[in-house]
């Protein structure tokens, strides 16, 4: 079908129009950031339905997330409705309104699940399977690995013994287990995991593959050796211009001869490189040499710098690539082959046993979804099955969003259900490889890259490629600067794709022509002498200043109206690679009273509040773990001081465990009595919680801990309180999820958490801020993908890349397999193997490439203006970055591969554009006119030196004086000295009042007097009983299950607050109508109606008290009060007390001139056998006598009239006080 001609005036660009209508072959749409790919995808679906008459359920639309799927289905449904309204007689559109609900617009996992549910018989599995929870899956896999390793310990194969010697430590085999897990997850990301594992040994056995790895390293070495030779020659040229440096030149000439031999004939002689020493030490530059070359001081420094660079580049090649002869590297591969083969065997055993366990429990995980789907769709020889053929016949087209984030299993599934080859297929793919940032999810961008390079713009003989390059999001300054940076940063060698004219961004948004340059702000840290703040804290304060400047000076352009409005908090986002800076930023913004939110899902287990709860759980599980026991003791909950812990240990210095020391201290006659009482209370809590944990699930134990110690309330009051509270809820919810698995108990839950920590798996805060809340946001680049903001502050640019994975004993790669060092068991020495060296080099290249893509995502989030924040310790390092070598249009490959952080590259590229002092051979262009408009950067570079006002010296040391110094001074006015001493010695007369709360609720006062009567100290109550306030219920508890008693109490109070009082009384029907009215007004939620105790309310309506209130002259409901406690003087007081009492009285009515108050109680109580109603009434009155007395005295104080009161118990009746 041909593409329809584009009418005049349509909103679509030519490339978008082609993307909507192109058909007849596989299509890959390379959609740059902000190019409207989602709108294009939706429009293509709509035109398939409207123009081509295709039923919506004959389209398979695959999205990356469930949220994306829901949004896309909603947008398609809306468009179908609009079309149906415009053409009500269209039967096809009416059918689509029905079929949209069955439409396959979902994630690939959801599609696979439906496939399994429909064809479970092919798999021979029980159709009543369920999806395992994350907790269950992790623990089951961990259990499986334990069992499989134990089996192999029984066999004790020599290769297994060597493996454990190499990959386990003296203390544990945790590292060995971790490697097995990693291999398992890598393998199941392949269409045939077993085959992938079997091929791991191939490079260790076959010389042909070893030769390929040697060549890979040689090619990479050539990059660094060539750069080293260039640096050496530059050093020689510079020294040649100077006097008195003959010895220096002689050293360099020797090095040049060695390097010439290595590079002889244009090839790298690896044997010569490994067999000789390079980088001889240069003679010192003496004062005489400096004097002789006083006019060339800079050249002298440059010469030394170039020789230093030469040495570092050669050292990298010799240490990272060829630390030994190539033949030795190959020989080690043969020795490692049996170990690699046996490791693959263990992982296959784990896979087999893990699958067996899942089948026995009738559970599936997400990996099963994909592999079972493949099993359904393929025959044993890998060809499409009959079921696959039926899906090929059914689906008119398959549309894949975010194609750059697919893995090889998903690619295989898609290939089974698509029709034709690339030149005549029905697969439509949309994505941007420059935004492929999910390597940790096994995303494989090479799938996109292979098609991008293979498909052509005309689609001749293969698939068709369409480039969507016009950006409708950002101002031209953001786009041109981004283009300039990536034009010189990204290519096939580093970045995996060339950033050429087809890849760059083109301006397409209707902004005005006002100037909005990108701002690169370089913060030079103040040293410890000039600031008490760390470098990170200085950067956080600096960011706040940028935000304040934006709010004060910047405007946001409204493209619809063509007018400006003032910038608000929500217009600003701070992007960072991770959340490491979150707490510093929270503090800095709090200091300036600027609303700020971090939706952190990283570093979760490092948060103070989470560490506290985990220490509690670990201490309850096993109090012999000193770190967690002492951590709990030192926490805000128990508040043991360091000197108290020291006292405990001093009396028992030789105990193995601190718990033993506590017990011994309690029993020691020399122990401090107060500390002993405190310890007894602590141990009593521990034992109580241990007993509780035996009979209750983990989430109830956590809930009890939260309630007992008011954990939620405490952390809610700290900086970032909403996020901290969400973190605590997150842990509680995880315990619920754990409880729903087949595992139970505190020990297993802790093991589950340990596994999450080991895998770096975070599940942090719920999103406590909505998209329209007016706050400054901080988020990671990953979480910002797909979003846009008027002002983007991209900070943390100077934080180094995380290269931890490159230091692991085993390097994994989907394409190449497994790289392992050679470990000599007899000598207990490890050596780099050919595979470990080669795969590490490949991994480093891929890591830097993905970091570049993260930078691209960050830069392209900005609409109005982009701020880049870098930080250096001194400005000398900037000069080095300006001097980075280039190769053609790019920063040299060796510089990019060894770049430590994004700032290293960004500053180097932009400074080369602006600095006039940089030599032409280090610039990309000699004249700005050479740059195309689309990539001509508009950037302001500012270098700011941090100044910390808080540490400025106000007084010299000799200006400080103490009271004692004043007394010893022999001169001066005695009257003035006496007056100063009086001021400094002044004692505040009401110091006791500072130890009491300034405001107390009636409930707190009630509790205080109750505890005093029972012998509990007031300080203890204040420390642990902050005032009753239940924390918000997690979402899953609010939506299902039974409500707690206190929640039902609140609900009943809400109903009673609005209850009408009529002399004729209201009927049960009217009561239901009244409740429905509360729901309609959103006073209460609809799902709460079932928990309202209608019979108890009807009992109250039929009571004498209801009639009395109905006949009253005046009725006041829910009356709050705040009163000075000193005025309420009818209860026993100590010294004059100026505390404030606050409370809420349920109802007050006036009858015959007398004021009465009513307090509703929903308490449940035990009616002991033989107790009369009168005895129960007396018992209930005594329970609330203090609270009621406060209410009565408070009202009498306020009203200056006699006040009487009623208690109404829904489960007992009326009590008059």
UniProtKB/Swiss-Prot annotation:
SUPFAM superfamilies: P-loop containing nucleoside triphosphate hydrolases, Restriction endonuclease-like. GO terms for biological process: double-strand break repair via homologous recombination. GO terms for cellular component: cytosol; DNA helicase complex. Coiled coil: none annotated. Its EC number is 3.1.-.-, 5.6.2.4. The keyword Phosphoprotein does not apply. GO terms for molecular function: 3'-5' DNA helicase activity; 3'-5' exonuclease activity; ATP binding; ATP hydrolysis activity; double-stranded DNA binding. Belongs to the helicase family. AddA subfamily. The heterodimer acts as both an ATP-dependent DNA helicase and an ATP-dependent, dual-direction single-stranded exonuclease. Recognizes the chi site generating a DNA molecule suitable for the initiation of homologous recombination. The AddA nuclease domain is required for chi fragment generation; this subunit has the helicase and 3' -> 5' nuclease activities. This is ATP-dependent helicase/nuclease subunit A. It comes from Staphylococcus aureus (strain MRSA252). The lineage of its organism: Bacteria, Bacillati, Bacillota, Bacilli, Bacillales.
């Amino acid at each position: 079908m041909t593409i329809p001609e584009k009418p005049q005036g349509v909103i679509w660009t030519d490339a978008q129009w082609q993307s909507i209508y192109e058909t007849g072959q596989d299509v890959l749409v390379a959609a740059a950031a902000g190019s409207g790919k989602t709108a294009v995808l939706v429009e293509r679906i709509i035109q398939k339905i409207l123009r081509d008459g295709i039923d919506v359920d004959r389209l398979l639309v695959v999205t990356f997330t469930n949220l994306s799927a829901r949004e896309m289905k909603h947008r398609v449904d809306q468009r179908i409705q609009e079309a149906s309204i415009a053409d009500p007689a269209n039967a096809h559109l009416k059918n689509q309104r029905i079929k949209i609900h069955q439409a396959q617009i979902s994630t690939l996992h959801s599609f696979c699940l439906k496939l399994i549910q429909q064809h479970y018989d092919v798999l021979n599995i029980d159709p009543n399977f369920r999806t395992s929870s994350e907790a269950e899956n992790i623990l089951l896999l961990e259990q499986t690995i334990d069992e499989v390793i134990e089996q192999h310990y029984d066999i004790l194969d020599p290769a297994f013994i060597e493996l454990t010697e190499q990959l386990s430590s003296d203390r544990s085999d945790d590292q060995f287990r971790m490697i097995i897990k990693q291999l398992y997850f890598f393998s199941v990301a392949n269409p045939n995991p077993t085959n992938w594992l079997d091929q791991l040994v191939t490079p260790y056995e076959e010389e042909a593959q070893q030769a390929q790895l040697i060549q890979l390293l040689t090619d990479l070495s050539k990059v660094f050796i060539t750069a080293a030779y260039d640096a050496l020659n530059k050093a020689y040229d510079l020294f040649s211009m100077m006097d008195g440096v003959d010895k220096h030149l002689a050293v360099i000439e020797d090095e040049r001869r060695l390097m010439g031999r290595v590079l002889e004939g244009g090839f790298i002689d690896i044997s010569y490189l490994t067999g000789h020493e390079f980088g001889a030490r240069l003679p010192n530059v003496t004062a005489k040499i400096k004097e002789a070359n006083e006019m060339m001081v800079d050249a002298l420094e440059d010469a030394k710098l170039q020789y230093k660079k030469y040495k570092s580049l050669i050292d990298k090649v010799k240490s990272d690539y060829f630390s030994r002869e190539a033949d030795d590297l190959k020989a080690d591969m043969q020795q490692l082959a049996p170990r690699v083969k046996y490791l693959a065997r263990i992982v296959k055993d784990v896979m087999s046993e893990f699958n067996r366990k899942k089948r026995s429990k009738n559970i599936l995980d997400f990996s099963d979804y994909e592999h079972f789907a493949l099993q359904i769709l393929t025959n044993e020889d890998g060809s499409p099955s009959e079921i696959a053929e039926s899906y090929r016949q059914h689906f008119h087209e398959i549309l894949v969003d975010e194609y750059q984030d697919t893995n090889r299993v998903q690619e295989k599934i898609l290939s089974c259900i698509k029709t034709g080859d690339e030149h005549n297929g029905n697969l439509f793919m949309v994505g941007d490889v420059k935004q492929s940032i999910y390597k940790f999810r096994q995303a494989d961008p090479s799938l996109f890259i292979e098609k991008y390079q293979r498909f052509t713009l005309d689609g001749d003989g293969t698939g068709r490629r369409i480039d969507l390059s016009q950006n409708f999001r950002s101002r031209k300054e953001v786009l041109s600067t981004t283009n300039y940076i990536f034009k010189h940063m990204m290519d096939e060698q580093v970045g995996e794709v060339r950033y050429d004219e087809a890849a760059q961004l083109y301006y397409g948004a209707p902004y005005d022509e006002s100037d909005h340059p990108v701002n690169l702000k370089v913060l030079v840290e103040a040293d410890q002498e000039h600031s008490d703040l760390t470098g990170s804290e200085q950067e956080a304060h600096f960011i706040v200043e940028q935000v304040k400047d934006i709010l004060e000076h910047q405007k946001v352009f409204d493209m619809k109206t063509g007018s400006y409005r003032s910038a608000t908090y929500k217009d600003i986002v701070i992007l960072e690679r991770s959340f490491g800076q979150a707490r510093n930023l929270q503090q800095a913004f709090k200091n300036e009273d600027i609303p700020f939110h971090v939706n952190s899902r990283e570093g979760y287990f490092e948060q103070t509040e989470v560490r506290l709860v985990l220490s509690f759980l670990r201490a309850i599980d096993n109090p012999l773990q000193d770190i967690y026991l002492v951590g709990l003791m030192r926490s805000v909950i128990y508040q043991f001081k360091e000197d108290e812990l020291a006292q405990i240990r001093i009396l028992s210095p030789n105990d193995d465990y601190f718990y033993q020391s506590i017990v011994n201290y309690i029993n020691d006659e020399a122990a401090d009595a107060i500390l002993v009482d405190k310890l007894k209370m602590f141990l009593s809590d521990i034992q109580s919680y241990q007993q509780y944990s035996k009979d209750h699930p983990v989430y109830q134990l956590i809930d009890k801990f939260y309630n007992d110690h008011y954990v939620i309330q405490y952390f809610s009051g700290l900086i970032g309180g909403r996020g901290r509270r969400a973190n605590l809820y997150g842990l509680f919810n995880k315990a619920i999820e754990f409880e729903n698995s087949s595992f139970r108990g505190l020990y297993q839950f802790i093991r589950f958490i340990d596994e999450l920590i080991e895998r770096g798996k975070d599940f942090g805060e719920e999103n406590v801020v909505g998209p329209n809340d007016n706050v400054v946001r901080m988020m990671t680049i990953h979480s910002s993908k797909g979003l846009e903001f008027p002002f983007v502050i991209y900070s943390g640019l100077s934080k180094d890349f995380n290269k931890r994975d490159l230091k692991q004993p085993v390097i994994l790669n989907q394409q190449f397999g497994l790289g392992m060092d050679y470990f000599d068991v007899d000598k207990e020495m490890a050596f780099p193997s050919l595979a470990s060296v080669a795969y590490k080099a490949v991994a480093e290249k891929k890591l830097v490439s993905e970091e570049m893509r993260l930078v691209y995502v960050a830069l392209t989030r900005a609409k109005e203006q982009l701020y880049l924040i870098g930080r250096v310790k001194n400005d000398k390092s900037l000069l080095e970055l300006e001097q980075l070598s280039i190769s053609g249009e790019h920063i040299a490959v060796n510089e990019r591969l060894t770049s430590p952080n994004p700032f290293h590259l960004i500053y180097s590229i932009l400074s080369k554009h602006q600095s006039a002092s940089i030599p032409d051979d280090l610039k990309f262009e000699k004249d700005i006119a050479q740059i195309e408009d689309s990539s001509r950067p508009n950037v302001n570079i500012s270098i700011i030196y941090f100044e910390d006002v808080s540490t400025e010296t106000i007084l010299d040391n000799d200006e400080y004086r103490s009271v004692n110094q004043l007394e010893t001074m022999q001169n001066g006015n005695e009257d003035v000295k006496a007056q100063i001493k009086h001021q400094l010695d002044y004692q505040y007369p009401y110091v006791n009042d500072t130890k009491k709360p300034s405001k107390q609720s009636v409930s707190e006062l009630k509790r205080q007097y109750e505890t005093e009567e029972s012998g509990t100290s007031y300080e203890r109550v204040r420390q642990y009983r902050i005032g009753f306030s239940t924390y918000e219920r997690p979402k899953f508890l609010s939506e299902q299950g039974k409500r707690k008693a206190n929640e039902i109490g609140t609900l009943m109070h809400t109903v009673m607050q609005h209850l009408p009082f009529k002399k004729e009384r209201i009927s049960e029907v009217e009561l239901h109508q009244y409740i429905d009215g509360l729901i309609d007004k959103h006073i209460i939620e609809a799902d709460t109606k079932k928990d309202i105790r209608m019979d108890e309310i009807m009992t109250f309506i039929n009571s004498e008290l209801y009639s009395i209130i109905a006949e009253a002259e005046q009725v006041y409901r829910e009356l709050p009060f705040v009163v000075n406690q000193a005025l309420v003087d009818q209860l026993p007081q100590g010294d004059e007390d100026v505390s404030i009492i606050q409370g809420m009285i349920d109802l007050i009515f006036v009858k015959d001139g007398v004021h009465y108050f009513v307090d509703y109680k929903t308490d449940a109580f035990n009616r002991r056998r033989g107790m009369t109603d009168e005895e129960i009434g007396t018992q209930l009155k005594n329970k609330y006598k203090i609270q009621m007395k406060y209410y009565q005295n408070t009202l009498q104080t306020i009203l200056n009239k006699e006040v009487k009161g009623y208690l109404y118990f829904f489960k007992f009746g009326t009590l008059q006080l």
